[in-house]
């Protein structure tokens, strides 16, 4: 699908790496799942705050995930929050802090997306004691172009693991 495709220049957070390409800003899952043979390989992009140029590259179509920014569920008693990839840490902190909760790993920039934190396995100020962001992820749902929708977990599962 050509919906929401625009030419764009992507730059790493520190400005050291840049590339020109196509950005797709889907606002519906069907724009992600739909096969589109004229598209180059696609890569998901969060807030774009990584120092590594992990969310763009020559010849790829970047899918900006920031429109997938819903908090789908929150159970303060179980200390579980379910979110879409484009939710920012600031949004998570705002919801969790109302219940006196927070994340053990808290990177310093609130505009970072949860999907970006998982992809980069970010850490806070004390990764030796608190671990990294992925250590707080129970499971995630991922769309793979050849295998479809996968539910991934750090514990053994039939699909694969994170």
Put a short name on every predicted segment.
Residues 11-108, 121-126:
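Glycine-rich N-terminal segment of FAD-binding domains in flavoprotein oxidoreductases
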Residues 1-26, 80-82, 131-144:
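Active-site-proximal helix-loop elements at catalytic-domain edges
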Residues 111:
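Short loop/turn segments at beta-alpha junctions that line or gate ligand-sensing/allosteric surfaces
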């Amino acid at each position: 699908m050509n919906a929401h495709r625009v030419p764009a220049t992507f730059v790493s957070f520190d400005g050291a790496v840049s590339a020109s390409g196509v950005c797709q800003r889907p606002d519906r899952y069907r724009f992600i799942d739909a096969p589109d043979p004229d598209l180059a390989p696609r890569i998901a992009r969060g807030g774009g705050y990584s120092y590594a140029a992990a969310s763009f590259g020559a010849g790829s179509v970047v899918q900006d995930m920031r429109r997938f920014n819903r908090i789908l569920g929150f159970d303060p008693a179980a200390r579980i929050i379910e979110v879409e990839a484009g939710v920012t840490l600031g949004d998570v902190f705002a919801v969790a802090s109302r219940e006196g909760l927070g994340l053990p790993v808290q990177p310093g920039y609130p505009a970072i997306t949860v999907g970006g934190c998982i992809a980069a396995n970010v850490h806070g100020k004390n990764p030796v004691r608190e671990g990294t962001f992925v250590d707080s992820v129970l499971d995630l749902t991922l769309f793979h172009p050849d295998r479809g929708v996968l539910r991934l977990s750090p514990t053994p599962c039939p699909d694969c693991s994170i």
